[in-house]
Amino acid sequence: MIALGGASGACLRFFISESMLKLLGRGFPFGTLAVNILGSLLMGILYGLLDKDIIAESPAKALIGVGFLGALTTFSTFSMDSLLLLQQGHFIKMALNIILNVMVCIFMAWLGLQLVMQKG
């Protein structure tokens, strides 16, 4: 279950990252930010569905939470992107990357949870 979810999440991450690179260029790690934002929103939704017993915990948590979302999102790439921006002297971009990845992703996880919890 985890491997199946992981393979799907990794493929989507690659597609999104490559698409963002082609669309917006290399000046800022938009691909990493995009997958982390999407993954955070989906994790909030998953947590809400699990909390309300709408989906079964073990299979969904393994397939979606650990596998798919674990492979889709990436803390290591976020860390490396931030380090490279620092080494290149792009201090404002580095700070923006850190702030956006942390604050926006936390907000999106909260939003995903709220979307589920407010229904019924």
From Swiss-Prot:
Na(+) binds at residues 70, 73. The chain crosses the membrane at residues 30-50, 66-86, 96-116. One of its GO terms (molecular function) is fluoride channel activity. Coiled coil: none annotated. InterPro entries: FluC. It comes from the Bacteria. It is found in: Cell inner membrane. Keywords: Cell inner membrane, Cell membrane, Ion channel, Ion transport, Membrane, Metal-binding, Sodium, Transmembrane, Transmembrane helix, Transport. Pfam families: CRCB. One of its GO terms (cellular component) is plasma membrane. It catalyses: fluoride(in) = fluoride(out). It is a multi-pass membrane protein. GO terms for biological process: cellular detoxification of fluoride. The keyword Iron does not apply. Belongs to the fluoride channel Fluc/FEX (TC 1.A.43) family. NCBIfam families: crcB (TIGR00494), PRK14200.1 (NF010796). Fluoride-specific ion channel. Important for reducing fluoride concentration in the cell, thus reducing its toxicity. This is Fluoride-specific ion channel FluC. It comes from Pseudoalteromonas translucida (strain TAC 125). The gene is fluC.
